[in-house]
UniProtKB/Swiss-Prot annotation:
Keywords: Activator, Biological rhythms, Developmental protein, Differentiation, DNA-binding, Myogenesis, Nucleus, Repressor, Transcription, Transcription regulation
Primary localization: nucleus
Bias (Basic residues): 34-43
Function: Acts as a transcriptional regulator. Inhibits myogenesis by sequestrating E proteins, inhibiting trans-activation by MEF2, and inhibiting DNA-binding by MYOD1 through physical interaction. This interaction probably involves the basic domains of both proteins. Also represses expression of pro-inflammatory cytokines such as TNFA and IL1B. Regulates cranial suture patterning and fusion. Activates transcription as a heterodimer with E proteins. Regulates gene expression differentially, depending on dimer composition.
Region (Disordered): 1-110
Protein name: Twist-related protein 1
PROSITE patterns to which the protein is assigned, alphabetical: BHLH
Pfam families, sorted: HLH
Start and end residues of each stretch annotated as Sufficient for transactivation activity: 166-196
Annotated source species: Cebus capucinus (White-faced sapajou)
All residue ranges annotated as the bHLH domain in the record: 113-164
Sequence ranges of Low complexity compositional bias: 1-18
Protein's cellular compartments: Nucleus
Gene that this polypeptide is encoded by: TWIST1
Length: 207
């Protein structure tokens, strides 16, 4: 019987079955190795991705804990920078205020200069006008009781001119002037004063 088993030929179907059974066994280790490599590579990639993030997190959050002195220093530095910025802004605002303040005195000085010049011109005009009226009062015959304003002085000057015109047109004065070379200024002044008091100037002014 042993000889029959050993000597019995193996059928091709049995060979194919045995080969098919051996092939999965052979293929399993490589797949297991590849799976292990993939798992390792995925773990490495995950570890690498978490590593920088963890390092960054450790550098930011882990390294500077809320109660750590490093974070306190950084907080002070950031506060100092913020204060410096605000101080710089305040300085800029102060500079703007100084520039505007520098412009306002100049405009005030210009206005003050214009006012002074206007006052000087007004004084000169008033002085020249007073001098002209003083000269006119010397020519016009006035009474001792006269305290004439500028308008009254001008009206009196107009009346005196009218009186002189009437004197020149008078026939009686023409006959008197034929015998006299001239009529004294005092007489004209007296005649004009009488003429004023009698109100003859109002009658002549109405003509």
């Amino acid at each position: 019987m042993m000889q029959d088993v050993s000597s019995s030929p193996v059928s091709p179907a049995d060979d194919s079955l045995s080969n098919s059974e051996e092939e999965p066994d052979r293929q399993q280790p490589p797949s297991g190795k590849r799976g292990g490599r993939k798992r390792r590579s995925s773990r490495r990639s995950a570890g690498g991705g978490a590593g920088p993030g963890g390092a960054a997190g450790g550098g930011v959050g882990g390294g500077d804990e809320p109660g750590s002195p490093a974070q306190g220093k950084r907080g002070k530095k950031s506060a100092g920078c913020g204060g410096g910025g605000s101080a710089g802004g305040g300085g800029g605002g102060g500079g703007g205020g100084s520039s505007s303040g520098g412009g306002s005195p100049q405009s005030y000085e210009e206005l003050q200069t214009q006012r002074v010049m206007a006052n000087v011109r007004e004084r000169q005009r008033t002085q020249s006008l007073n001098e002209a009226f003083a000269a006119l009062r010397k020519i016009i015959p006035t009474l001792p009781s006269d305290k004439l304003s500028k308008i009254q002085t001008l009206k009196l000057a107009a009346r005196y001119i009218d009186f002189l015109y009437q004197v020149l047109q008078s026939d009686e004065l023409d006959s008197k002037m034929a015998s006299c070379s001239y009529v004294a200024h005092e007489r004209l002044s007296y005649a004009f004063s009488v003429w004023r008091m009698e109100g003859a100037w109002s009658m002549s002014a109405s003509h």
